[in-house]
């Protein structure tokens, strides 16, 4: 079953509309909540008058920041830590009177219907005392009066650094020293389903049905926000319309949970708009990089120095980890004896930066891979050859986090496949020294990516399996299907171990913190690796129990038993069907024992996935237009559990990477920090008309510590596209663009400065 492109187990329900998402489960009599957002970018609420809103017919309750529990809580979807030093930053309140960005949450209305709730918002009167707004981290990191958060006087959330060797000496010994600066934009996840939840009370407990990647973590954070025992909360996650990391944060679930307690436990739906999703949930961080490198006369890297300054926005979210995670890429993959990495994550009066597909690696990869091309150009070397000269060959460990290692390293095979597809050598020569308005170029980039979060953070997962009366197997996990095909992969893993047809594996796609085993959720490309390890162990345990029970039923001479597609086989002969054995286990008067298996494990391992992107582009210099002619991603993600799903995963990530490179950016007003293009009309996502044919290929090297030889694939496809496109434009035009996306405005400005227009 492993390695087969079986159809998705949830495909039929989704394409026929039978799949139930959060909004499908909202009861008909549900109240509706809407949030009043601040209309300034920085300041305090001096007064708030809700009397007119409360008097409106149909309004059930109005709450303000004065009414909510005064508990600061963390929002990122990380496992909790019993060690204070490893706990996430708790800087958020359910509602606030201290406005830190345009759109901050001040009050909420609960009404009988959505129209009434919206009308009530317009009747709330607020008076502010405004403070200066700062949206640029390089300015904000020198402090503001007052600081954005009182405990961070310089507005620096966290500073990270490491040193390997002696960078200063390495630079002195270098033949050539190159310095460059790069900047990446704020972008938004743009998942199909906006964050939505429905909360109600039952038997004195709060039940929250919501669209999340992290149901067990949502439960804990609601408890922290409300100051109540976590066992008083139940979180249910049905089908989810995408997340890409935005729903790896606890968003408005604590507010919704609080609101139901204020209306007698009646159901309350909190469904935010697309505009609110852009401004009030999470974004990918904008990060600025200053890079320095020294190379010897043969092009070997002798020293590397990175300074990263990350725009965190108004609250901490995942910010303490994003830029630091990016720093790890600076020391991986390329051999260099002297390395320095330093990162500052800075509060600003902007929408909050959080987790997004790649978790800081798309930003740092853009900087590193653009820099590698710029170095190669400076020293007159082919960019591919320069990379090959400096890449680490074979097995290697992270110098700082040695449990993290490239146990298999297929990067050279990936590069060979990508270069062959794009005809690298021929086109590098063909497109040299072009003139005219229309020019072509080829570019490439590569990446490395960890699988999961161990040893930086906890990795734990749980699985439960039951042999049903008909001989099929029920599978229940705390890990979440968020559209990526996880349920199909877990079903394949179970079927592989039990030697069953996948149609006989019935996976429960709904996570319920009262019922499903504990798992931290969908993030860090961890599930097929971490949860997959537990699924394999649980299936093996179930198999042992099935065969042990079979031995009790069968004659002594039939001792060597095995499972084979619904049968217990004694050698080559069928001994008893799994269905009949299951009936015996449930209903035998003399030997009834329902066969179940449950495993919860801490998974202490990590492995590095790698890959590359090659792109060929055509540039219209006068129009500032880029047309992608050919593009390919090649991934070493170990053994592919489901090749078709893997290909689809890569294609989706490549589309996201192309948007990151060409069109996507959240533009903020300089004076207020308010998003100026926070709609799907103005925020330029890649469409079908913009997307070229996308090629995905793989190098399948079985990873020795992956449960089935597999490793990360969920996030890596989104990483290398943007720098590959930028480097292709560099080859085509000779102009180096050090900030993405490469919009027509940015291209024309660069071409004018270079004298091409």
Language-model segments: which ranges?
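Glycine-rich loop/linker segments at domain edges
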Residues: 4, 10-13, 82-86, 154-197, ...
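Short acidic, glycine/serine/threonine-rich loops at helix termini
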Residues: 72-77, 120-123, 219-221, 244-250, ...
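Conserved catalytic cysteine-centered active-site region
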Residues: 97-98, 229-231, 236-237, 262-273, ...
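Thiamine diphosphate
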Residues: 239, 243-270, 486-493
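Helix-loop-helix junctions that connect adjacent transmembrane helices in secondary transporters/permeases
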Residues: 144-226, 390-472, 599, 676-688, ...
């Amino acid at each position: 079953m492993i390695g087969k492109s079986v159809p998705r187990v949830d495909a039929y329900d989704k394409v026929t509309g039978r799949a139930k998402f959060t909004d499908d489960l909202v009861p008909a009599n549900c109240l509706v909540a809407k949030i009043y957002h601040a209309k300034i970018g920085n300041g305090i609420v001096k007064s708030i008058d809700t009397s007119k809103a409360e008097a409106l017919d149909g309004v059930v309750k109005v709450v303000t920041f004065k009414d909510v529990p005064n508990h600061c809580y963390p929002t990122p979807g990380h496992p909790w830590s019993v060690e204070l030093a490893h706990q996430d930053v708790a800087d958020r309140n359910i509602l606030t009177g201290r406005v830190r960005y345009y759109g901050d949450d001040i009050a909420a209305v609960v009404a009988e219907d959505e129209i009434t709730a919206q009308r009530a918002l317009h009747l709330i009167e607020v008076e502010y005392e405004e403070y200066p707004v700062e949206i640029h981290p390089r300015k904000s990191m020198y402090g503001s009066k007052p600081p954005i958060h009182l405990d961070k006087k310089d507005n620096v959330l966290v500073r990270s650094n490491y040193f390997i060797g002696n960078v200063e000496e390495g630079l002195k010994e270098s033949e050539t020293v190159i310095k460059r600066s790069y900047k990446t934009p704020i972008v938004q996840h743009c998942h199909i389903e906006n964050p939505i939840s429905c909360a109600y009370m039952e038997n004195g407990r709060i039940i929250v049905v919501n669209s999340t990647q992290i149901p067990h973590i949502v439960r804990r954070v609601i408890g922290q926000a409300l100051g109540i025992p976590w066992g008083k909360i139940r979180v249910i996650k049905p089908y989810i319309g995408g997340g890409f990391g935005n729903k790896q944060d606890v968003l408005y679930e604590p507010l919704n949970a609080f609101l139901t307690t204020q209306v007698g436990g009646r159901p309350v739906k909190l469904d935010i708009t697309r505009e609110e999703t852009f401004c009030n949930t999470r974004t990918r961080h904008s990060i600025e990089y200053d890079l320095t490198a020294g190379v010897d006369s043969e092009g070997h890297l002798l020293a590397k120095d990175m300074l990263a300054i990350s725009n965190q926005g108004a609250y901490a979210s995942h910010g303490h980890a994003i830029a630091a995670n990016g720093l790890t890429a600076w020391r991986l993959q390329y051999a260099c004896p002297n390395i320095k990495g330093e990162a500052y994550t800075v509060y600003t009066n902007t929408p909050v930066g959080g987790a997004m597909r790649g978790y800081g690696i798309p930003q740092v990869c853009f900087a590193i891979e653009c820099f590698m091309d710029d170095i190669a150009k400076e020293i007159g070397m082919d960019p591919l050859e320069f990379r090959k000269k400096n890449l680490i060959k074979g097995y290697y460990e992270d110098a700082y986090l040695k449990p993290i290692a490239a146990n298999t390293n297929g990067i050279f095979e990936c590069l060979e496949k990508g270069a062959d597809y794009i005809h690298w050598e021929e086109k590098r020569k063909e497109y040299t020294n072009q003139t005219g308005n229309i020019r072509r170029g080829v570019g490439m980039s590569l990446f490395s990516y960890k699988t999961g979060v161990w040893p930086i953070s906890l990795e734990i997962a749980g699985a439960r399996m039951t042999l049903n009366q008909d001989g099929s197997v029920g599978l229940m996990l705390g890990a979440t299907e968020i559209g990526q095909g996880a349920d199909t992969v877990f079903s394949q893993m179970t079927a592989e171990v039990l030697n069953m047809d996948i149609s006989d594996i019935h996976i429960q796609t709904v996570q319920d913190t009262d019922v499903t085993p504990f798992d931290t959720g969908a993030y860090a490309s961890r599930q097929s690796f971490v949860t997959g390890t537990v699924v394999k162990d649980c299936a093996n345990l179930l198999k042992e129990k099935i065969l042990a029970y079979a031995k009790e039923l069968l004659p002594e001479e039939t001792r060597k038993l095995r499972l084979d597609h619904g049968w217990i086989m004694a050698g080559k002969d069928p001994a008893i069907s799994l269905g009949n054995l299951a009936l015996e286990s449930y209903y035998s008067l003399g030997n009834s024992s329902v066969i179940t298996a449950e495993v919860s494990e801490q998974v202490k391992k990590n492995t590095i996935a790698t890959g590359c992107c090659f792109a060929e582009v055509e540039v219209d210099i006068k129009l500032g237009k880029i047309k992608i002619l050919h593009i390919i991603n090649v991934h070493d993600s170990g053994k592919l559990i489901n090749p078709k799903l893997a290909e689809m995963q890569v294609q989706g990530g490549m589309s996201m990477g192309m948007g990151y490179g060409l069109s996507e950016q959240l533009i903020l007003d300089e004076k207020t920090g308010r998003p100026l293009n926070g709609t799907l009309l103005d925020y330029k996502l890649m469409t079908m008309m913009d997307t070229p044919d996308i090629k995905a290929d793989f190098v399948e090297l079985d990873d020795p510590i992956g449960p089935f030889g597999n490793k990360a694939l969920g996030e890596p496809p989104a990483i290398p596209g943007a720098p590959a496109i930028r480097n292709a434009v560099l080859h085509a035009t000779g102009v180096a663009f050090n900030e993405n996306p490469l919009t027509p405005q940015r291209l024309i400005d660069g071409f004018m400065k270079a004298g091409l227009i």
